UniProtKB/Swiss-Prot annotation:
Cysteines joined through disulfide linkages: none
Name of this protein: Lipase maturation factor 2
Broad class of the protein's primary localization: endoplasmic reticulum
Protein encoded by which gene: lmf2
Cited function: Involved in the maturation of specific proteins in the endoplasmic reticulum.
Species classification: Eukaryota, Metazoa, Chordata, Craniata, Vertebrata
């Protein structure tokens, strides 16, 4: 792969934006989710157990342990961490010098600290993915304090940036594999997308239209998903540039389609950011129309010709990938019906055999790719002139190469979860290494949409309140489906974590969601912070004047409406049918409710509130009072609009380069530049003496150097 300086810079810029979104989105929900009287109070996770301070910090690594030393309770410490994280990530988004390893280390520590007390509301795969990506950014980002005069170039950059490609491979490959290993009949029958759009957590309006597409197209889309998630990732580590670029665009197209048809917070955006690892600088600067230097000499021409011949191998490789897809999914064009017919033409046993065969070869191919990057880094370090610079570059190469090998090694444990037989064949030392760092979320296993839920109707919990236990009023949420006539929400990149957990709660008995009892309890109390999670505008909350006396929850099945045979659009987005009672009617002091709360420790009294008159608590209260009325999606969209406005104005009037485009000066050590200049001068003299057009050649070379 060619140079990836701009690709790396784009990755760091994009990750800064993802961090900003994650911190701001979570900040808006802290009082209702984790406050002293929230649904799952965070202070319960920070109880001192008699161990020493540093021992507790080791067991549960979180900056929240330092909150009491600053005069802050747990909730306010979380708010301060979110605000600091948002401010730091905003700075990294706007200023390239802040995209530093130390800055990304702080961002990772901030999010890990929140994750430790997040409980069920932060246990999503994208939270784990952000933590793993964030830690890799610590290795990928430049350490400006150690580079002195060289602010961009380092011999180990290709080694550490390779880890993001490996993470992207594990994410996409596992996401495709688990769909088949789960034995879900909809994934095996290629009908999953006929249910997906209406059964996803928070559909958007485009999901309704996607649901209306013909069945043959939905089945073909599932085949395309397998092709992109299972087949294409196998191309990530092959030495063929065009295959990598094809991999990049296929992955990005898939993520964009998911973004267009669902509200998946920052997950798909983070995946697109990881896709930067498949790009090189030549492709990023393609539209700048840089002229390529003229190659001189038979040796260069021969090498170029050999490279051209080798690069032709990408055509048969791509052809084989398409052939296997057509064969194993029996793709056939039905000209009469103007459709593409498809079916799964292999068995579960066949797939397991293939998976067992392919798992370790993918590891060895990835290891060979990493080894090649390490060798290239060693060569670059050895090419640096000057004893001091050479030693300094070699030392960095050794340290970061060892770190990359260690990260790759421990990641093999969660990666091989796709085939437990392969997982059992890993060396015991690898498992011990993984267990030693597991608490820090450095590496994780992935596999989204393992099984398609909602076959036979989308289950939805509808909460109802009453004053007399006779007349019940539905409590409508801002984002999740409820009223069948309400237009589905568009809230990306915000994640309303209560709405998401309501979707999971509907999939099982209420006993599988202990937090739901606490949620009902807070609504009976009329807790303003919890109500704010349900409706930002209190006037839309049906019990804003007085809390309800009774609350219950009903389980419904929802389906998207359909266009009738005449082509007329329906008046409602949804149709629904009552299934059963999800949670019985309860009231404050109800023995059933009290028993649930006591059983899960959700009725414990919080510790005494700390003084709010100190400077830091006072400042945090002012910020909260200012931002509290704003809906979280509006707050995030305002940030995004403001950031792009700043970049637009800079591009128009400031002459500032585009985001992610690194400046090229000081890209190599000074001695390396002198060597290049010296060699260039000697080459020009030789060319001028050996050619009748020597003067033209020199002028042409100088022109290329300037461009």
């Amino acid at each position: 792969m060619g140079e990836q300086r701009l690709a790396r810079s784009s990755f760091l810029w994009g990750l800064s934006g993802i961090y900003l979104v994650a911190f701001v989105s979570l900040y808006a929900q802290i009082p209702g989710l984790y406050g002293r009287e929230g649904i799952l109070p965070a202070w319960k996770m920070m109880r001192f157990t008699g161990k020493g301070f540093w021992e507790q910090l080791k067991d549960s690594p979180s900056l929240l342990w330092f909150g009491p030393r600053l005069g802050l309770d747990t909730e306010m410490t979380m708010e301060m961490i979110c605000l600091l994280g948002a401010l730091l990530s905003l700075g990294a988004l706007l200023f390239s010098f802040l995209r530093d390893s130390l800055v990304f280390l702080l961002l990772w520590i901030f999010y890990l600290s929140l994750y430790q007390v997040g409980q069920v509301f932060l246990y999503f795969q994208w939270d784990s993915l952000l933590l793993e990506t964030g830690f890799l950014a610590v290795l990928v980002a430049p350490v400006h304090a150690l580079r002195w005069k060289t602010s961009v170039w380092s011999s180990h950059d290709g080694v550490t940036f390779w880890l993001t490609r490996w993470l992207l491979f594990r994410l996409m490959f596992a996401s495709g594999i688990v769909k088949l290993t789960s034995r879900c009949p909809t994934w095996w029958g290629l009908t999953a997308l006929t249910y997906h759009y209406e059964t996803q957590c928070i559909p958007n309006p485009a999901a309704w239209f996607a649901h209306q597409l013909p069945v043959w197209f939905q089945k073909f889309s599932v085949v395309a998903t397998y092709f992109i998630e299972i087949g294409v990732p196998l191309l990530f580590f092959l030495p063929f540039r065009r295959l990598r670029l094809f991999s990049f665009y296929s992955q990005v197209v898939l993520q964009i389609l998911i973004i267009m048809t669902g509200n998946y917070n920052f997950f798909n955006l983070l995946t697109v950011v990881l896709c930067c690892s498949l790009l090189d600088d030549q492709h990023i600067t393609f539209f700048q129309r840089h002229k390529k230097p003229q190659h001189k000499g038979g040796r260069v021409t021969s090498a170029f010709s050999l490279y051209s011949l080798i690069s032709l191998l990408d055509v048969p490789i791509f052809g084989l990938l398409v052939f296997w897809t057509v064969k194993y999914f029996d793709l056939q064009i039905n000209w009469e019906k103007h459709s593409v017919e498809s079916r799964t033409a292999f068995t579960y046993h066949d797939f397991q055999q293939w998976l067992r065969t392919i798992t370790f070869p993918t590891i060895w191919i990835a290891a060979a790719s990493l080894g090649w990057e390490i060798l290239k880094g060693m060569y670059r370090s050895a090419s640096v002139r000057g004893i001091f610079w050479k030693l300094w570059s070699t030392l960095q190469w050794v340290i970061f190469s060892c770190a990359a090998v260690a990260m790759f090694t421990i990641s093999l444990v969660p990666y091989t979860y796709i085939d437990f037989e392969s997982n059992g064949h890993l060396w015991p030392e690898v498992h011990r290494m993984f267990n030693a760092v597991d608490r820090y979320q450095l590496v994780n296993s992935y596999g989204l949409f393992r099984r398609m839920t909602g076959v036979g109707g989308r289950p939805e919990v509808i909460v109802e309140g009453s004053y007399d236990r006779e007349t019940w009023t539905e409590i409508e949420f801002m984002y999740k489906p409820g009223n069948i006539s309400t237009t589905p929400s568009v809230i990306i990149p915000h994640q309303p974590r209560l709405d998401w957990q309501m979707w999971f709660a509907a999939l099982a008995h209420n006993s599988h969601s202990p937090w739901f009892a606490s949620f009902v309890y807070r609504l009976l109390q009329g807790n303003k912070d919890v109500i704010h999670l349900v409706q930002n505008d209190e006037s839309l909350y049906p019990f804003h004047a007085y809390p309800p006396t009774y609350i219950r929850a009903q389980l419904y099945k929802y389906w998207f409406t359909e266009v009738d045979q005449s082509g007329q659009m329906p008046k409602s987005w949804w149709r629904r049918r009552h299934v059963e009672e999800f949670f019985p009617a309860v009231f404050l002091g109800d023995p059933f409710l009290d028993n649930l709360l006591t059983q899960h420790g959700l009725k414990d009294k919080p510790p005494a509130r700390r003084s709010l008159d100190a400077p830091i608590p006072s400042a945090l209260r002012l910020i909260r009072a200012f931002l509290h009325p704003l809906p979280a999606p509006l707050l995030l969209h305002s940030f995004i609009f403001g950031i792009f406005t700043i970049y637009f104005l800079q591009a128009m009037f400031g002459g500032v380069s585009k985001p992610g485009v690194a400046k090229q000066r000081h890209s190599k050590p000074p001695n390396e530049k002198k060597k290049q200049k010296s060699n260039s001068g000697q080459g020009e003299s030789a060319a001028a003496k050996s050619s009748g057009h020597g003067a033209d050649t020199v002028r042409r070379n100088k022109k290329n150097e300037k461009s």
